[in-house]
Amino acid sequence: MFGRFLELSVTTPDIAASVQFYERLGFAQLATGDALPHPYGVLSDGRLYLGLHQRTGPARRLSFVHPGLARHVHELLDAGFEPHAARLGDDDFHELQLRDPAGQDIALLEARTFSPPRSDHDRSHCGWFSGYSLPAFDIEQVRDYWERAGFVALDVTDDPLAQVALTSDTLTLSLHQPRAIAAPLLVFTDPDMPERLARLAAAGVHAARGLPAGLDPRANALFEAPEGTLLLLIAEG
């Protein structure tokens, strides 16, 4: 329904500082096009694509690509999705903006805005990107929204944070209670996470405060990017 996941679009007041932070975590820059009017860069670990946008607007958007977007509007409306903003003019780079019941911003774009990597990139220093976790007071309402968008919901029983996982072929979302942590999270896992955390600390990348309750700080850590994006690194197994 939404198309293929493109990137987590992140608004940053200082794109250079954000790029430097993610490169220290092992992300690599990709080539971008000229469809956007503001400074824009993309970094990836081979699974996650972070689009850094030096502009005003929502802090984070989940961006998808759906060719023929103008013709797709009626299908979205019929399925109960109502865009709150649209750019569909003949001279526009077509875009629809939506928002899920938990307040997560979503963008549907006519075409890609960066070139995919020519070869697989090794995972970042953070470990395996397992998904994007959203805080949601009404888990069932948010679950229904993403199921209607084509995601498959799975109940989670062995995760220290997430209660529901929502999967597609290009992105996994999870839902957690805001009392655990009130912000969205990029979640990475690795069975050897303590060693990864030690290497990051030795390289001068230090964890932020506010690790969700129940997670051992010796084996798990929360990092905050300059623009405010939170990355949760969890020991797996």
What is the predicted role of each segment?
Residues 50-53, 173-175:
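A short acidic-to-branched-hydrophobic micro-motif
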Residues 1-2, 9-49, 133-171:
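Core segments of cupin and vicinal oxygen chelate
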Residues 1-16, 60-62, 109-144, 149-155, ...:
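N-terminal beta-strand motif that seeds the catalytic metal site of vicinal oxygen chelate
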Residues 21, 30-32, 37-42, 46, ...:
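Acidic (E/D-rich), amphipathic helical modules within compact regulatory domains
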Residues 4-13, 42, 55-134, 154-160, 165-167, 172-174, ...:
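Vicinal oxygen chelate
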Residues 34-35, 56, 88-90, 178-180, ...:
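A short beta-turn/loop motif at secondary-structure boundaries
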